Amino acid sequence: MANRSIRDGDNPELLEERRMATFDTDKMAAVIYGSEEFARRRREITDAVSKIPELADIKPYPFLTREEKVTEGTRKISILTKYLNQLIDRDNEEESLHLHREVIGYEGHPFALHDALFIPTLQSQASDEQQEKWLERARRREIIGCYAQTELGHGSNLRNLETTAVYDIASQEFVLHTPTTTALKWWPGALGKSCNYALVVAELIIKRNNYGPHFFMVQLRDEKTHIPLKGVTVGDIGPKMNFNAADNGYLGLNNLRVPRTNLLMRHCKVEADGTYVKPPHAKIGYSGMVKIRSQMAMEQGLFLAHALTIAARYSAVRRQGHLDDKQVEVKVLDYQTQQHRLFPSLARAYAFIFTGFETIHLYSQLLKDVDMGNTSGMADLHALTSGLKSVVAHETGEGIEQARMACGGHGYSMASYISVVYGIAIGGCTYEGENMVMLLQLARYLVKSVELIKAGKAKKLGPVASYLADKSDETDLTSLNGYVKMFENMARRQAWKATEKFLKLMESGESREVAWNKSAVELTRASRLHTRLFIIEAFMRRVSRIEDIPVKEVLTDLLHLHVNYELLDVATYALEFMSFTQLDYVRDQLYLYLEKIRPNAVSLVDSFQISDMQLRSVLGRRDGHVYENLFKWAKSSPLNNADVLPSVEKYLKPMMEKAKL
């Protein structure tokens, strides 16, 4: 079998690992990225980028100031725009995303939200006439846009957004206004200094009637001078935990007037006389958010893959301590504790990516259905992606932090780059909806499903919730399907338990809101179990369709590791369905599959095919030459430009001289 990462001159420690591969890493990459064609295109794009010197980092990112990071991201994006047509198919979103990650990494750039939310929202919410006016300009990058929804005082609670858009019938204009400090738009990427347009989410008000949040196309800056327009207050919100090459911003609007036709009108409309034509589905305007959430499982899986590539490779290079042979130190990756720290997260990375394929497909199908006037799948996908967004982002953060600690002291260095990946990934716990709020949105769906069953209407359940009506308590763990049944038992029991608590509180006289709040912890637990069940099923479905036998065998091992680890992780919910003997069996199976995965561990992370340019890690570099390059990296620190720092001359030397007196 072939690990395609082998090159002459590699560290012998990694060469030894790669020669143990039982599968072809290119074929595994085709499974990870959905097709042989796209896996090949990723490699071609990576190779092409490596031949353009202008796109190389001017110096390691950790040594750049914030302003230098913003400038570097902007420099690269301007150069990249020049080469786009020869590097990628501009209509291929996957190719574009890979190219930008290859060149810019995770630090951010002015077109991140432009491509991820601004353009997709125009595609899904703007009428044909509006798309003709704005969409091609956005695609050509004549204008730079952002998505301005979150406010300083309100994030996930869209019902209480303060920004208003009052319709003036006489002038046929909307008057947009942020009446308070807490109404300021806050956080949108590129809003601070880069973008000149924004899709502003504001409360639509006609004749004092509030029709809820709607999208408005708003010009913020003059297209020639880039100076903010009158009535627009805009700026950068300052440094963040990470993503500091992005100018996340604030926006205030002081009675800014825009034409009536700047309301995005694909699904709703305001006539000249103020007549409001409502959309076919109340949440159809949220399709942009649903898209982001549908992509998040895959995106977070790739963040986790990035960190694990670094940690697994370094763990195969690092030797410390002894086992049987007292003359040779052992590879850190041979310790069971290190395997237990990394391999379950590796299984999750694959599981999240495979789950992402399913949700992206479901979103694509939803768009087709909506165009045909069918919005029946909206609630199901909204609930599913809400749960996935929360569970996957949280578990990814946990896995990345474990990967960092698995690298020992060097993991704490910015040379590892893991802390950067962590800072980006855990942003997913709050952007596009705070995690607890997302779990509770899924919980509403689960409660409604249980109520349907109680009312004898189980046939109305969506396919994802149909197990809630099952009465089987099967506990056979001799097959993967048995593990699925066990998770169904746990998720069903918790969903019913949480729903019954909620209903009993209302029966006792509590208001619906208070009863919901008092049941919230149990409801979020139900949502997590439901989501983890879906992830396991998605992993199983993907593995079942693989045709290459060696690839299928190693992914089956990874799947077995995953289901055993996940079951142990939530074992308190399983105790009423399984014996302690079965629990011991699950634990033994986990340790067995840690051993089975060990020979393929490095090849499994190599299969993600993350280049050194994108990896940006001294510890995880492909050739494994860690120590000499760590020394080289340290010497490049700007503090080493002078043997004696000005601060030493100014403060320390006088202090020490004074102490001698």
Swiss-Prot record:
Cofactor: FAD
Catalytic activity: asc-omegaC5-CoA + O2 = asc-omegaDeltaC5-CoA + H2O2
Effect of residue 432 to A: Increases ATP and FAD binding
GO molecular function, one term: acyl-CoA oxidase activity
Gene Ontology cellular-component annotations: peroxisome
Residues binding FAD: 147-150, 155-156, 189, 318, 338-341, 409, 434
Pfam families membership: ACOX (PF01756), ACOX_C_alpha1 (PF22924), Acyl-CoA_ox_N (PF14749)
GO terms of biological process kind: ascaroside biosynthetic process; fatty acid beta-oxidation using acyl-CoA oxidase
The enzyme's E.C. designation: 1.3.3.-
Binding residue positions for ATP: 340, 390, 394, 402, 525-528, 573
Expression induction or repression: Induced by high temperatures (25 degrees Celsius). Down-regulated in dauer conditions.
Principal place of residence: other
Keyword Mitochondrion applies: no
Record-listed substrate binding positions: 283-286, 293, 431-432
Site, as annotated: Important for asc-omega-C5-CoA binding and thus substrate specificity: 299
Quaternary structure, from the entry: Homodimer. Forms a heterodimer with acox-1.1.
Its job: Involved in the first step of peroxisomal beta-oxidation by catalyzing the desaturation of fatty acid-derived side chains of ascaroside pheromones, which regulates development and behavior. Specifically, shortens ascarosides with 5-carbon omega side chain (asc-omega-C5). Does not shorten indol-3-carbonyl(IC)-ascaroside with 7-carbon or 9-carbon side chains. Does not catalyze the desaturation of fatty acids or hydroxylated fatty acids.
PANTHER family, per the entry: ELECTRON TRANSPORT OXIDOREDUCTASE (PTHR10909), PEROXISOMAL ACYL-COENZYME A OXIDASE 1 (PTHR10909:SF250)
Name of the featured protein: Acyl-coenzyme A oxidase acox-1.2
Organism for this UniProt entry: Caenorhabditis elegans
